[in-house]
């Protein structure tokens, strides 16, 4: 299920689908997604280290969270660990405390983490299975708040459109970039980026997820405008760097 949430944007869910396709023991109550991200110093995290950390994190989560849930499943997606909880509405605050406790237990395990840092993003709690996808989106948005809030925290975001949307900074970047690329003026390109950066950081109430989203959009536009042969590989490398960005 969590793998499908990561890779299938058209995924539709219902209580019946959760039971019949994914074999979950769902009950009326609340659904909530959590997302945890590993950030290794120098982005040199090795696959066996990633798995070792995630297996320990899963062990802690399964031991503590399942006591208060109808069902709880986890899935590892590279440097991300996702979990989906289905629990009685009355357990909402208790679940929140347990998730925080589990996260803190893992943060204390320096023997596992070494130089790796963790961040945990909480999705919104939803009543209907069809809204689990929205909780998944919010969990990932919450993780992006580490750009402003820092690592080693349990983070939360809301479902608002944010404050950058009305500033149309991506449109401004596109216009300014066009003239800069026509003249191949490196300094003008650098200035274009700096102007957008400064306007972004000076915007009151800006969220980390908005910044990350804008960086992705501007970066993709820049790559598409470049006259280079392997744009797909360049885009993949850029996306990976965005995933591993921990500060602005």
Question: Predicted segment positions?
Answer:
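Charged/polar positions within long, soluble alpha-helices
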Residues: 111, 115, 223-231
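AAA+ ATPase "lid" subdomain C-terminal helix
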Residues: 201-205, 224
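Short, well-ordered alpha-helical segments
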Residues: 168, 226-239
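Interdomain helical linkers/hinges and coiled-coil/dimerization scaffolds
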Residues: 1-101, 122-128, 133-147, 151-184, ...
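Short, intrinsically disordered, charge-balanced linker/junction segments flanking boundaries
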Residues: 241-248
